[in-house]
Amino acid sequence: MRHPHLADLALSFPALLFALAVPRPDVDPERAIACVIAGRPLAEAAAAAGLPLWLRKLPPEAFVRPIPPLPNGELFRRQIGNHLPRSPKLMPTWLQLVAEMAALAHEAAAVWIAREYLRAPKRDHMHLLGLWIWFSGQPGCFGRELIERPWTPAMKLDAARTAAFAWRANTTLHLNIGQRPIRNMWLNPGRVGDYEFRPLDDIPAIVEEAVVMRNCVRTYDDDIAHNRSRLWSVWRNGERVATLETGLHCHDPLLNIVQLEGPGNAAAPRELWWIARRWLHLHDLPQIETGRIKWRQAPLDLATWRRLWRPYWLAKRRIPDWLPLAPSRAAFAAL
């Protein structure tokens, strides 16, 4: 490494010098070193080292770890120069995020994160953002069907994070509930006077209730999966009037009414509470076992998990450790 041509790289191409001194595990630097010593064009040496030429614009402070594979498409090269960090302190993380987002999603997403990280230097939930961005461009995929607001390059980072979190909430609902109706609702549908109690026992019913009643019952999927909650819709004269949650309350071993609320979470009238209690007590409560599951121990739905992620695995030609083949609550929560 003590050749004058190599030393010249400190000024002409710091990234290449760093890559030769601290190569990636999958790159043998000897061919690139030979190119430099022989006076070959820098483009040839960079290609041998697996580096894009646009890295010439970055100073030595940008490199603190082996340089990961980076995007190098023609459009990317034209755009990335507009989003280079001015602060040397931001450069190592910025470079890592550009590489990561290109691998997670695509080059357009890498340009986007290069820009947005400079506006708002946040780097959490990159796996989630990358998945949401990738599925945003995959019409026909189940993962795309669950996206309410798809990614566009014009989005700000905070708006993208909000949309990605909403997508994760939708995917969580499907992973927790699965594709089949909930088998044990604990109670039976019934009628008391003019009021009818209908089970919210599958995803379409829960989502429809959330939309019509303007409430957040579609976020109750964790409680449902762990047998801590069941949801019911209360109707009168052919219209929804309230949403009812049943479960165990405090130290009471018998099934109880946990919540009863009208449209928009309005307080239910006293009369409706009495009707709901009468319906509840039509059942043999001491004989009902909810089968509560220890928190975070309920399995996610295997068929839904693989239906959701299979297109991504195939497109990327790998199953990453952070998105395993077997359903994992820990892996999903870490996104």
Predicted features and spans:
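Glycine-focused motif/segment detector
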Residues: 1-335
